[in-house]
Protein backbone atom coordinates (compact mmCIF):
# COMPACT_ATOMS: atom_id res chain seq x y z
CA UNK A 1 0.00 0.00 0.00
CA UNK A 2 2.86 2.45 0.87
CA UNK A 3 4.61 1.73 -2.47
CA UNK A 4 1.35 2.59 -4.30
CA UNK A 5 1.03 5.94 -2.53
CA UNK A 6 4.66 6.84 -3.22
CA UNK A 7 4.24 5.95 -6.90
CA UNK A 8 1.11 8.11 -7.19
CA UNK A 9 2.80 11.10 -5.54
CA UNK A 10 5.83 10.80 -7.81
CA UNK A 11 3.63 10.62 -10.91
CA UNK A 12 1.66 13.67 -9.84
CA UNK A 13 4.85 15.65 -9.23
CA UNK A 14 6.25 14.71 -12.65
CA UNK A 15 3.03 15.61 -14.43
CA UNK A 16 2.84 18.87 -12.54
CA UNK A 17 6.36 19.73 -13.65
CA UNK A 18 5.51 18.90 -17.25
CA UNK A 19 2.35 20.97 -17.01
CA UNK A 20 4.22 23.95 -15.64
CA UNK A 21 6.87 23.67 -18.34
CA UNK A 22 4.32 23.46 -21.13
CA UNK A 23 2.36 26.41 -19.74
CA UNK A 24 5.41 28.64 -19.55
CA UNK A 25 6.10 28.19 -23.27
CA UNK A 26 2.57 28.39 -24.64
CA UNK A 27 0.66 30.72 -22.34
CA UNK A 28 2.07 33.73 -24.07
CA UNK A 29 0.82 32.39 -27.41
CA UNK A 30 -2.69 32.01 -26.01
CA UNK A 31 -2.62 35.46 -24.50
CA UNK A 32 -1.68 37.01 -27.87
CA UNK A 33 -4.65 35.38 -29.62
CA UNK A 34 -7.34 38.00 -30.20
CA UNK A 35 -10.26 35.73 -31.04
CA UNK A 36 -12.02 34.66 -27.84
CA UNK A 37 -12.97 31.16 -29.03
CA UNK A 38 -9.52 30.52 -30.41
CA UNK A 39 -7.92 31.79 -27.18
CA UNK A 40 -10.18 29.50 -25.07
CA UNK A 41 -9.36 26.54 -27.28
CA UNK A 42 -5.68 27.35 -26.82
CA UNK A 43 -6.00 27.26 -23.04
CA UNK A 44 -8.03 24.03 -23.17
CA UNK A 45 -5.41 22.44 -25.37
CA UNK A 46 -2.71 23.20 -22.85
CA UNK A 47 -4.37 22.83 -19.45
CA UNK A 48 -7.18 20.41 -20.37
CA UNK A 49 -4.81 17.73 -21.67
CA UNK A 50 -2.65 17.96 -18.57
CA UNK A 51 -5.68 17.68 -16.30
CA UNK A 52 -6.87 14.61 -18.21
CA UNK A 53 -3.46 13.00 -17.85
CA UNK A 54 -3.40 13.85 -14.16
CA UNK A 55 -6.86 12.39 -13.64
CA UNK A 56 -6.00 9.17 -15.43
CA UNK A 57 -2.71 8.87 -13.59
CA UNK A 58 -4.34 9.50 -10.23
CA UNK A 59 -6.92 6.82 -10.97
CA UNK A 60 -4.16 4.44 -11.94
CA UNK A 61 -2.36 5.24 -8.70
CA UNK A 62 -5.49 4.54 -6.71
CA UNK A 63 -5.90 1.26 -8.56
CA UNK A 64 -2.36 0.35 -7.55
CA UNK A 65 -3.14 0.85 -3.88
CA UNK A 66 -6.61 -0.71 -3.96
CA UNK A 67 -6.97 -3.26 -1.15
CA UNK A 68 -8.20 -6.57 -2.43
CA UNK A 69 -11.08 -8.11 -0.46
CA UNK A 70 -10.16 -11.14 1.65
CA UNK A 71 -11.30 -14.50 0.45
CA UNK A 72 -13.75 -16.66 2.44
CA UNK A 73 -10.88 -18.93 3.45
CA UNK A 74 -8.96 -15.90 4.83
CA UNK A 75 -11.92 -14.50 6.77
CA UNK A 76 -13.30 -17.83 8.05
CA UNK A 77 -12.96 -18.24 11.81
CA UNK A 78 -12.10 -21.79 12.76
CA UNK A 79 -14.11 -22.78 15.83
CA UNK A 80 -12.42 -24.93 18.44
CA UNK A 81 -13.97 -28.41 18.75
CA UNK A 82 -16.37 -28.77 21.68
CA UNK A 83 -16.00 -31.97 23.69
CA UNK A 84 -19.23 -33.96 23.96
CA UNK A 85 -19.81 -35.63 27.31
CA UNK A 86 -20.27 -39.40 27.31
CA UNK A 87 -23.26 -41.11 28.89
CA UNK A 88 -21.15 -42.01 31.92
CA UNK A 89 -19.92 -38.42 32.33
CA UNK A 90 -23.48 -37.12 32.18
CA UNK A 91 -24.85 -39.76 34.54
CA UNK A 92 -22.25 -39.13 37.26
CA UNK A 93 -21.71 -35.41 36.47
CA UNK A 94 -17.99 -35.91 35.91
CA UNK A 95 -17.34 -32.63 34.07
CA UNK A 96 -18.00 -29.02 35.18
CA UNK A 97 -20.58 -28.62 32.38
CA UNK A 98 -22.60 -31.60 33.65
CA UNK A 99 -22.72 -30.60 37.34
CA UNK A 100 -26.24 -30.21 38.75
CA UNK A 101 -27.76 -29.18 42.07
CA UNK A 102 -27.39 -31.04 45.34
CA UNK A 103 -30.22 -32.72 47.26
CA UNK A 104 -32.18 -33.58 44.10
CA UNK A 105 -33.25 -37.22 43.69
CA UNK A 106 -32.22 -39.02 40.52
CA UNK A 107 -32.37 -42.63 39.39
CA UNK A 108 -29.55 -44.95 40.44
CA UNK A 109 -30.04 -48.59 39.48
CA UNK A 110 -32.85 -49.42 37.03
CA UNK A 111 -36.37 -48.85 38.35
CA UNK A 112 -38.64 -51.55 37.00
CA UNK A 113 -41.77 -53.63 37.46
CA UNK A 114 -41.64 -57.15 36.04
CA UNK A 115 -45.15 -58.60 36.53
CA UNK A 116 -44.12 -61.86 34.85
CA UNK A 117 -41.02 -63.26 36.57
CA UNK A 118 -40.58 -67.03 36.22
CA UNK A 119 -37.92 -69.01 38.07
CA UNK A 120 -36.72 -72.55 37.48
CA UNK A 121 -36.84 -73.29 41.20
CA UNK A 122 -38.57 -71.34 43.98
CA UNK A 123 -36.87 -71.24 47.40
CA UNK A 124 -39.66 -72.57 49.64
CA UNK A 125 -37.49 -73.28 52.71
CA UNK A 126 -34.56 -70.82 53.00
CA UNK A 127 -31.68 -71.76 55.31
CA UNK A 128 -28.28 -70.51 56.52
CA UNK A 129 -25.55 -71.96 58.81
CA UNK A 130 -26.47 -69.69 61.74
CA UNK A 131 -30.25 -69.46 61.23
CA UNK A 132 -31.07 -73.02 60.30
CA UNK A 133 -33.88 -73.86 57.92
CA UNK A 134 -37.13 -71.93 57.87
CA UNK A 135 -40.51 -73.60 57.75
CA UNK A 136 -41.41 -74.44 54.18
CA UNK A 137 -43.94 -72.30 52.33
CA UNK A 138 -45.45 -74.98 50.14
CA UNK A 139 -47.80 -72.66 48.29
CA UNK A 140 -45.09 -70.44 46.81
CA UNK A 141 -45.36 -70.35 43.03
CA UNK A 142 -42.54 -70.24 40.51
CA UNK A 143 -44.19 -67.33 38.73
CA UNK A 144 -44.08 -64.11 40.73
CA UNK A 145 -43.38 -60.41 40.18
CA UNK A 146 -40.18 -58.45 40.73
CA UNK A 147 -40.05 -54.76 41.61
CA UNK A 148 -37.05 -52.48 42.07
CA UNK A 149 -36.91 -48.82 43.09
CA UNK A 150 -33.51 -47.12 43.31
CA UNK A 151 -32.75 -43.42 43.86
CA UNK A 152 -29.71 -41.28 44.63
CA UNK A 153 -28.99 -37.70 45.63
CA UNK A 154 -25.78 -35.69 45.67
CA UNK A 155 -24.86 -34.47 49.14
CA UNK A 156 -21.60 -32.58 48.55
CA UNK A 157 -19.73 -31.26 45.52
CA UNK A 158 -15.98 -30.64 45.18
CA UNK A 159 -15.57 -32.83 48.27
CA UNK A 160 -11.90 -33.41 49.24
CA UNK A 161 -10.71 -33.61 45.61
CA UNK A 162 -11.41 -31.41 42.55
CA UNK A 163 -14.66 -32.42 40.86
CA UNK A 164 -15.35 -35.23 43.37
CA UNK A 165 -18.90 -35.68 44.72
CA UNK A 166 -20.44 -37.45 47.70
CA UNK A 167 -23.71 -39.28 46.99
CA UNK A 168 -26.36 -41.04 49.03
CA UNK A 169 -28.43 -43.82 47.45
CA UNK A 170 -31.27 -46.09 48.48
CA UNK A 171 -32.40 -49.22 46.62
CA UNK A 172 -35.29 -51.57 47.33
CA UNK A 173 -35.95 -54.84 45.50
CA UNK A 174 -39.02 -57.01 46.18
CA UNK A 175 -40.17 -60.46 45.10
CA UNK A 176 -43.97 -60.42 45.12
CA UNK A 177 -46.09 -63.56 44.87
CA UNK A 178 -48.61 -61.60 42.83
CA UNK A 179 -50.12 -64.71 41.24
CA UNK A 180 -50.43 -66.61 44.53
CA UNK A 181 -54.09 -66.10 45.42
CA UNK A 182 -54.02 -69.00 47.86
CA UNK A 183 -51.72 -67.09 50.23
CA UNK A 184 -53.20 -63.64 49.46
CA UNK A 185 -50.29 -62.61 47.20
CA UNK A 186 -47.60 -62.07 49.88
CA UNK A 187 -44.24 -60.39 49.39
CA UNK A 188 -41.79 -63.28 49.59
CA UNK A 189 -38.75 -61.07 50.22
CA UNK A 190 -37.70 -57.41 50.11
CA UNK A 191 -34.07 -56.24 50.22
CA UNK A 192 -33.16 -52.73 51.38
CA UNK A 193 -29.82 -51.09 50.64
CA UNK A 194 -28.79 -47.59 51.77
CA UNK A 195 -25.27 -46.52 50.79
CA UNK A 196 -22.81 -43.64 50.60
CA UNK A 197 -20.73 -43.24 47.43
CA UNK A 198 -17.68 -41.11 46.74
CA UNK A 199 -17.15 -40.50 43.01
CA UNK A 200 -13.82 -39.11 41.76
CA UNK A 201 -13.55 -38.11 38.07
CA UNK A 202 -10.36 -39.01 36.18
CA UNK A 203 -8.99 -36.48 33.69
CA UNK A 204 -8.35 -37.44 30.07
CA UNK A 205 -4.62 -36.94 30.58
CA UNK A 206 -4.49 -39.63 33.27
CA UNK A 207 -7.18 -41.97 32.01
CA UNK A 208 -5.98 -42.95 28.53
CA UNK A 209 -6.01 -46.69 27.87
CA UNK A 210 -5.10 -48.73 24.77
CA UNK A 211 -7.75 -49.01 22.07
CA UNK A 212 -9.24 -45.54 22.79
CA UNK A 213 -10.72 -46.68 26.10
CA UNK A 214 -10.84 -44.02 28.80
CA UNK A 215 -10.92 -44.32 32.60
CA UNK A 216 -13.72 -41.97 33.63
CA UNK A 217 -13.97 -42.30 37.40
CA UNK A 218 -12.95 -44.00 40.61
CA UNK A 219 -15.62 -44.99 43.12
CA UNK A 220 -15.57 -45.74 46.83
CA UNK A 221 -18.50 -46.57 49.06
CA UNK A 222 -20.03 -48.14 52.12
CA UNK A 223 -23.38 -49.96 52.13
CA UNK A 224 -25.74 -51.93 54.34
CA UNK A 225 -28.09 -54.53 52.88
CA UNK A 226 -30.78 -56.44 54.74
CA UNK A 227 -34.21 -57.96 54.20
CA UNK A 228 -35.72 -56.68 57.43
CA UNK A 229 -37.14 -60.06 58.47
CA UNK A 230 -37.01 -61.83 61.80
CA UNK A 231 -35.04 -65.00 62.42
CA UNK A 232 -34.77 -67.53 60.83
CA UNK A 233 -35.43 -65.54 57.62
CA UNK A 234 -33.20 -62.59 58.57
CA UNK A 235 -30.38 -61.86 56.12
CA UNK A 236 -27.98 -58.91 56.20
CA UNK A 237 -24.42 -57.71 55.66
CA UNK A 238 -22.29 -54.57 55.57
CA UNK A 239 -19.61 -53.80 53.01
CA UNK A 240 -17.12 -51.25 51.77
CA UNK A 241 -16.18 -51.18 48.13
CA UNK A 242 -13.83 -49.65 45.59
CA UNK A 243 -13.86 -49.69 41.83
CA UNK A 244 -13.39 -47.87 38.56
CA UNK A 245 -15.34 -47.25 35.38
CA UNK A 246 -14.14 -46.96 31.78
CA UNK A 247 -15.90 -46.27 28.51
CA UNK A 248 -15.41 -46.09 24.76
CA UNK A 249 -18.15 -44.61 22.60
CA UNK A 250 -21.37 -46.52 23.28
CA UNK A 251 -19.64 -49.11 25.48
CA UNK A 252 -18.95 -48.91 29.22
CA UNK A 253 -17.32 -51.18 31.82
CA UNK A 254 -17.59 -50.97 35.59
CA UNK A 255 -15.56 -53.06 38.03
CA UNK A 256 -16.15 -53.11 41.79
CA UNK A 257 -14.58 -55.03 44.63
CA UNK A 258 -16.80 -55.56 47.69
CA UNK A 259 -15.09 -56.13 51.03
CA UNK A 260 -17.44 -57.48 53.64
CA UNK A 261 -17.25 -55.99 57.13
CA UNK A 262 -16.94 -58.97 59.44
CA UNK A 263 -19.52 -59.80 62.13
CA UNK A 264 -19.11 -61.96 65.19
CA UNK A 265 -20.75 -65.28 65.95
CA UNK A 266 -24.50 -65.36 66.17
CA UNK A 267 -24.79 -61.78 64.92
CA UNK A 268 -23.98 -62.98 61.42
CA UNK A 269 -27.11 -64.08 59.55
CA UNK A 270 -25.13 -65.46 56.61
CA UNK A 271 -21.42 -66.13 57.33
CA UNK A 272 -20.81 -67.85 53.98
CA UNK A 273 -22.44 -65.12 51.87
CA UNK A 274 -19.31 -64.15 49.89
CA UNK A 275 -18.60 -67.81 49.06
CA UNK A 276 -21.82 -67.83 47.03
CA UNK A 277 -22.35 -64.36 45.61
CA UNK A 278 -18.69 -63.36 45.27
CA UNK A 279 -16.79 -60.16 46.06
CA UNK A 280 -16.08 -59.00 42.48
CA UNK A 281 -18.74 -57.36 40.33
CA UNK A 282 -18.20 -56.49 36.67
CA UNK A 283 -20.84 -54.75 34.57
CA UNK A 284 -20.68 -54.20 30.81
CA UNK A 285 -23.03 -51.67 29.23
CA UNK A 286 -23.94 -51.18 25.59
CA UNK A 287 -26.12 -48.34 24.31
CA UNK A 288 -26.79 -49.00 20.59
CA UNK A 289 -29.20 -46.19 19.80
CA UNK A 290 -32.65 -46.54 21.39
CA UNK A 291 -31.92 -49.86 23.10
CA UNK A 292 -29.80 -50.52 26.19
CA UNK A 293 -28.05 -53.70 27.29
CA UNK A 294 -26.27 -54.50 30.56
CA UNK A 295 -24.50 -57.72 31.49
CA UNK A 296 -23.43 -58.13 35.13
CA UNK A 297 -21.18 -60.90 36.42
CA UNK A 298 -20.51 -61.55 40.12
CA UNK A 299 -17.92 -64.02 41.37
CA UNK A 300 -15.21 -64.53 43.97
CA UNK A 301 -12.77 -66.28 41.59
CA UNK A 302 -12.33 -68.93 44.31
CA UNK A 303 -15.59 -70.66 43.37
CA UNK A 304 -16.05 -70.18 39.64
CA UNK A 305 -19.06 -72.50 39.66
CA UNK A 306 -20.87 -70.04 41.94
CA UNK A 307 -21.62 -66.37 41.60
CA UNK A 308 -24.14 -65.19 39.02
CA UNK A 309 -24.74 -63.38 35.78
CA UNK A 310 -27.64 -61.11 34.88
CA UNK A 311 -28.66 -59.62 31.53
CA UNK A 312 -30.93 -56.57 31.31
CA UNK A 313 -32.34 -55.36 27.98
CA UNK A 314 -34.57 -52.31 27.52
CA UNK A 315 -36.29 -50.61 24.59
CA UNK A 316 -38.61 -47.56 24.63
CA UNK A 317 -42.34 -48.16 24.42
CA UNK A 318 -42.50 -44.90 22.43
CA UNK A 319 -39.28 -44.08 20.53
CA UNK A 320 -40.07 -40.36 20.67
CA UNK A 321 -39.89 -40.47 24.50
CA UNK A 322 -36.51 -41.93 25.37
CA UNK A 323 -36.90 -41.21 29.11
CA UNK A 324 -40.44 -42.59 29.26
CA UNK A 325 -41.61 -46.16 29.77
CA UNK A 326 -39.30 -48.83 28.37
CA UNK A 327 -39.83 -52.53 27.84
CA UNK A 328 -37.55 -54.44 30.20
CA UNK A 329 -36.36 -58.03 29.77
CA UNK A 330 -34.22 -59.55 32.54
CA UNK A 331 -32.48 -62.93 32.68
CA UNK A 332 -30.64 -64.27 35.74
CA UNK A 333 -28.63 -67.39 36.47
CA UNK A 334 -26.77 -68.32 39.65
CA UNK A 335 -26.83 -67.53 43.35
CA UNK A 336 -28.14 -64.49 45.18
CA UNK A 337 -30.93 -63.00 43.11
CA UNK A 338 -32.16 -61.89 46.54
CA UNK A 339 -30.49 -61.95 49.97
CA UNK A 340 -32.86 -64.69 51.07
CA UNK A 341 -31.68 -66.76 48.09
CA UNK A 342 -27.95 -66.05 48.55
CA UNK A 343 -27.10 -69.79 48.76
CA UNK A 344 -29.89 -70.99 46.47
CA UNK A 345 -29.23 -71.54 42.76
CA UNK A 346 -31.87 -70.71 40.17
CA UNK A 347 -32.45 -69.52 36.62
CA UNK A 348 -35.10 -66.89 36.01
CA UNK A 349 -36.53 -64.64 33.34
CA UNK A 350 -38.70 -61.56 33.81
CA UNK A 351 -40.61 -59.27 31.48
CA UNK A 352 -42.08 -55.88 32.26
CA UNK A 353 -41.35 -52.16 32.05
CA UNK A 354 -38.73 -49.75 33.30
CA UNK A 355 -40.77 -47.24 35.27
CA UNK A 356 -38.83 -43.97 35.11
CA UNK A 357 -35.39 -42.56 34.41
CA UNK A 358 -34.28 -39.08 35.45
Positions of PLM-derived features:
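Outer-membrane beta-barrel initiation region
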Residues: 51-183, 190-195
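Outer-membrane beta-barrel "beta-signal"
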Residues: 193, 329, 346-358
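Outer-membrane pore/translocation modules
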Residues: 123-134, 141, 156-286, 295-299, ...
